[in-house]
Amino acid sequence: RLKKGDVPKDLDRLEAQILKTTSGIARGPRGYLSLINRVKPLIQAGEVVVVTGDFNEPSHQDWTQAAAKRGMDRWVKNTSGRPLRFKVAWAGSVALEKVGLSDAYRTRFPDEIKKPGNTWTPPYPDGLPGRQPYHHQVLDRIDRIHFTGVHLRVLDAAVVGEDKRICEIAHSGPWVSDHRAVVATFEFTGSAEKLSNPKNDRNKSKGTKY
């Protein structure tokens, strides 16, 4: 709709339409609910859980009300006359948060305006087979690391890619993927025994980095 110049005035209604249209992602066999059903018992048992991947959906922690007012225009070449930035409480990331999984990048960089952390998609020349022109792309952070664990702490997180101006870590050679990579450093503040048996708190240690 936006590419055709159909810019809605009621953004709350647009958000509802987007969530309805994308609801199948969460319910699908490779979607969020399948993941949550597998990790929820581990989380409830107090286990350390780290989940990472290409989620094929943005995060509600990026599409915030603040970003809607002051954030970047996500459309590479916007021809609509209105910035592509509005609030959307994306259902998948909301569901992960509700089950107790935190976003490593947003834990390290809570300001979604200064640090958008986009992983989709690095620039590429027009005419590549199977890819639309780059100026049609919408930039977003769809590759993420989520974690939980009372003894797990984020020390650092980064996007890895082709340009230091965009990424915390720049690759020295050609970047051939259509996604940027993500990495995080964690500290386990408990003992090795807690890592294998999180309900046993008898031993203490200064912490281990992973």
Regions found by a protein language model. Give the residues of each.
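Active-site regions of metal-assisted phosphoester/phosphodiester hydrolases
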Residues: 1-210
